[in-house]
A protein has these predicted regions:
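Acidic/aromatic-lined carbohydrate-recognition and catalytic surfaces
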Residues: 2-173
């Protein structure tokens, strides 16, 4: 399966929701603001929008520390707002690309909270853990450090970028 033909010539407009149009006066851009500006974006010659992370997050890293991939961050709106954005964009012949963060989650994600428990459970292996509390993961290319001493589980967990972003285990097949 190759690249879709529409992707060869599309022009995307990248949107960081927080700094886009604020429609409710709280000082933070939101999905309704993006919906209001779809005609403007289309008039610029853009055929799609690339939406930076918009999911529930504690926002230690601008939303790249996702706590719930199934819920829009309340500061940006609701899941219904996101559905409306897709609908309105598609009505205008525009594509919507969501910025997915597949390498890590937030330490506040439910998977990670369960993974931190000393008792083995279905989430134990979803993150990159070692039983060696002093492991620095230098032999793993994309790992930038580790976090330790914060849970009932022995050892430490690898992180991507910041200490609030535990690395997901790509070797976990489920």
């Amino acid at each position: 399966m190759g690249m879709p033909s529409w992707l060869e010539n599309i022009v995307f407009y990248e949107i960081y929701p927080q700094s886009f149009l604020d429609t409710d006066g709280d000082g933070i851009g939101n999905i309704q603001g993006i919906i209001r500006k779809l005609d403007y974006i289309k008039d610029l010659g853009c055929d799609g929008i690339w939406l930076n992370p918009c999911f529930a997050s504690p926002f230690y890293d601008a939303g790249y520390d996702v706590a719930d991939y199934k819920k829009v961050a309340p500061r940006y709106g609701t899941n219904e707002d996101l559905k409306e954005l897709f609908q309105k964009a598609h009505e205008k012949g525009m594509k919507v690309l969501l910025d997915l963060v597949p390498g890590h989650t937030s330490t506040e994600h439910e998977w990670f909270k369960e993974s931190c428990k000393a008792e083995k459970n279905e989430y134990t292996d979803r993150y990159v853990w070692t039983n060696n509390i002093w492991d620095d993961f230098k032999d793993v290319g994309s790992i930038t450090g580790s976090i330790r001493g914060f849970s009932s589980r022995n050892g430490c967990c690898a992180v991507n970028f910041f200490s609030v972003q535990p690395a997901l285990n790509f070797g976990f097949a489920r």
